Amino acid sequence: MKRSGILNAELGEALATLGHTDLLLVVDAGFPVPRDAHRIDLALAENLPDLRTVLGLIADELVVEGVVRAEDVPSHNPRLDSWLHERFSGAEFTTRPHAEVLGELAREAKAVVRTGAFEPWGNIGLYCGVDAPRWFGGEGVVVPEQYASKV
């Protein structure tokens, strides 16, 4: 039996397949997941599991270099936005119109993880990165400019 971390087999498998720049969407209970998306449905009941728990567990296992959320999040759900900035402090943050998060980003995502969250604008995209110190830390390796501050 696995000792810790994410125990859900489907989610664990999806995380293991993600590569640099791949997008993972972690969404609330009401998100309209596209029919052809790789849907990982964790929702059991209202706020079970909640968005922050799922994002936190994923963050413990995944290198995240970018976070995208609806442009409404900073003004309409500032507590969530603040939490995201704390939890993903090394990531670049961007916003998109809410309709794009529901449409274009959902189609772009390698997987969509549905939580039980009843969280306004609780649909968060995570762009995968690389562990820069481990990736570029070898002797004689020239570190690309965009990773220099992370090595």
UniProtKB/Swiss-Prot annotation:
Species this protein is from: Streptomyces griseus subsp. griseus (strain JCM 4626 / CBS 651.72 / NBRC 13350 / KCC S-0626 / ISP 5235)
EC number of the protein: 5.4.99.62
Pathway assigned in UniProt: Carbohydrate metabolism; D-ribose degradation; D-ribose 5-phosphate from beta-D-ribopyranose: step 1/2
Oligomer status and interactors: Homodecamer.
Domain of life, per lineage: Bacteria
Organism ancestry: Bacteria, Bacillati, Actinomycetota, Actinomycetes, Kitasatosporales
GO biological process assignments: D-ribose catabolic process
Entry binding sites for substrate: D28, H98, W121, G122, N123
Gene Ontology MF annotations: D-ribose pyranase activity; intramolecular lyase activity; monosaccharide binding
Name of the protein this chain belongs to: D-ribose pyranase 1
